[in-house]
Each structure stands twice: as structure tokens, then as C-alpha cells.
From Swiss-Prot:
This is Protein FAM219A. Residues 1-47, 59-132 are annotated as: Disordered. Belongs to the FAM219 family. The gene is fam219a. Pfam families: FAM219A. Residues 123-132 have a biased composition (Low complexity). Residues 67-81 have a biased composition (Polar residues). InterPro entries: FAM219 (IPR029339). It comes from the Eukaryota.
Length: 186
């Protein structure tokens, strides 16, 4: 009986397997090999060049892994110690402290762009840390006017008038029944 060949499975290419072109050579080699069942049929399968190339790459990878002493899946292998960077070459920043040997020409990692430089000028306020609330309020109003916002000049009461008041006894829209009675559609 012939074995069924899966059409998605790539058959292995053996380097010792010869592709025979002449049928006369086929019969002489079959006679020289071990006796076979008379029902078996020899399959002359020629793999595609892509399959041959893939098989060669697999063989080279197997030979390389045997040479290096790493046999098995690369996922299960641990990294080699010579692949790890030396501790002296690693730059580890201190937590919250700037490096003393940092040159002044280095740029910061994050640069914030602002429209004007005087947005948060702390020199206006007193050095004691306590400044009058009026001064802060004036500064905020000036900044809001600069930015184009007039939030403090428009009262909020007008927006509250748009919300309708809730009734004490809500009624059904379809039959005007109150919440205590059952709604009946007429």
C-alpha cells in the first residue's frame, strides 16, 4: 500500500538521494537494494528549487547549533554571558538627581514649547511666598484676556435657565397617568 502524502507537508531532501532520469538505471539500482514488496511503486519526486534551498538552510542551521553546543529550540536556550553588555558600559541614571559629569551642551529629553516666556513668571510675587490674593487674581485675569478667554465676565446663571424644572408628580407622555397609577394606552 502506498502512504498518502500530505500536500502541505514539505518532503525532506536527502543529499544521498539521487534523482534518476534514465529508467534503465532505476531498474539496476532497485535490483541492487534490499528486496521490496512487488506491490510498491517507486516515486520519482523532484523537489522544487525553493524546497531544496530551505532544506539546505535547515541543515546549515542544524550543523551550526551542533557546533555551538546548542541543540534544541532557540526559545528554550538561555542567552550567553558574552552577549550581555559589561556593567561599566551601562549608564544608569540616579533617581531624581542630575549627573554631575553631564555636559552643558546636552539637550533635555523633553522640551516644552510655550507661546510666551512670561506665562509663569514668579518674580512678580513676593519672595516670602505670600502674595495678596488680589495680585494673583489680577494676574490671572490678565492671562485669561491674553489667551482670548473671557470666562469671568460672562455670568453662568443664563446656562442654568435652560434646564426645565422637574414636576412634583411626573406623568406618562402617552396617557398623562401619574407614576402611582398604571399606564394605559388608548
Amino acid at each position: 500500500m502506498m502512504e498518502e502524502i500530505d500536500r502541505f507537508q514539505v518532503p525532506p531532501v536527502n543529499p544521498e538521494m539521487k534523482l534518476l532520469q534514465d529508467p534503465a538505471e532505476t531498474s539496476t539500482i532497485e535490483n541492487e537494494t534490499a528486496p521490496r514488496e512487488p506491490e510498491s511503486v517507486a516515486i520519482n519526486y523532484k523537489p522544487s528549487p525553493l524546497q531544496v534551498k530551505i532544506e539546505k538552510q535547515r541543515e546549515l542551521a542544524r550543523k551550526g547549533s551542533v557546533k555551538n553546543g546548542t541543540v534544541g529550540s532557540p526559545v528554550n536556550q538561555q542567552p550567553k554571558k558574552n552577549n550581555v553588555m559589561a556593567r561599566t558600559r551601562l549608564v544608569v541614571p540616579n533617581k531624581g538627581y542630575s549627573s554631575l559629569d553631564q555636559s552643558p551642551d546636552e539637550k533635555p529629553l523633553v522640551a516644552l514649547d510655550t507661546d510666551s516666556d512670561d506665562d509663569f513668571d514668579m518674580s512678580r510675587y513676593s519672595s516670602s511666598g505670600y502674595s495678596s490674593a488680589e495680585q494673583i487674581n489680577q494676574d490671572l485675569n490678565i492671562q485669561l484676556l491674553k489667551d482670548g478667554y473671557r470666562l469671568d465676565e460672562i455670568p453662568d446663571d443664563e446656562d442654568l435657565d435652560l434646564i426645565p424644572p422637574k414636576s412634583v408628580n411626573p406623568t406618562c407622555m402617552c396617557c398623562q397617568a401619574t407614576s402611582s397609577t398604571a399606564c394605559q394606552i388608548q
